[in-house]
Amino acid sequence: LCDPDFADWPLGEPGVVADLQRWVRARSRMTLYAHTFDALAQRCGRWIAWRRQWSHAVDCRSDGELEAADYPSLCLVPGVISIRLLDPVLSRGIASYEAVDALACREAVDAVSQRSIEAFPVTTLGI
């Protein structure tokens, strides 16, 4: 998954968390790329709790040198589907099962992932 901030994603919805629970039991892995994870932390408590339990299967990464606009909004499940948001204002995008569209999404994610580092720790240590 990739998005500037995941503010418009329904990751905290009970149905989404239930689907992710079933999905992760198949020994799958998930990587999220974002400019900032603040909206996710504030709005998606269920997802945060789920991630705490499954942190070994979920990576959150960011590249502080990129601008928010450099992050595409997309979901890529290799070999299954690619979903790309083209216009967030009008909620318009493309869902595709075609390999060529998956490749375009992979290339967009690769551009972000190359210099990304781990971000959004599961727990924060304080003094």
Predicted regions and their residues:
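PLD-like (HKD) phosphodiesterase/transphosphatidyltransferase domain
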Residues: 1-32
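Short catalytic/ligand-binding loop motif for oxyanion handling, primarily in non-cytosolic enzymes
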Residues: 8-9, 40-41, 83-84, 91
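Amphipathic coiled-coil/heptad-repeat helices and related helical stalk/stem segments
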Residues: 13-16, 43, 105
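Hydrophobic helix-cap positions at the C-terminus of alpha-helices
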Residues: 19-23, 50-51, 112
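A general structural signal for well-ordered secondary-structure junctions
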Residues: 29-30, 57, 118
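HKD-type phospholipase D/PLD-like phosphodiesterase module
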Residues: 33-78
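HKD (HxKxxxxD) catalytic microenvironment of the phospholipase D
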Residues: 59-106
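Charged phosphate-binding loop/patch that engages nucleotide di/tri-phosphates or the phosphate backbone
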Residues: 108-127
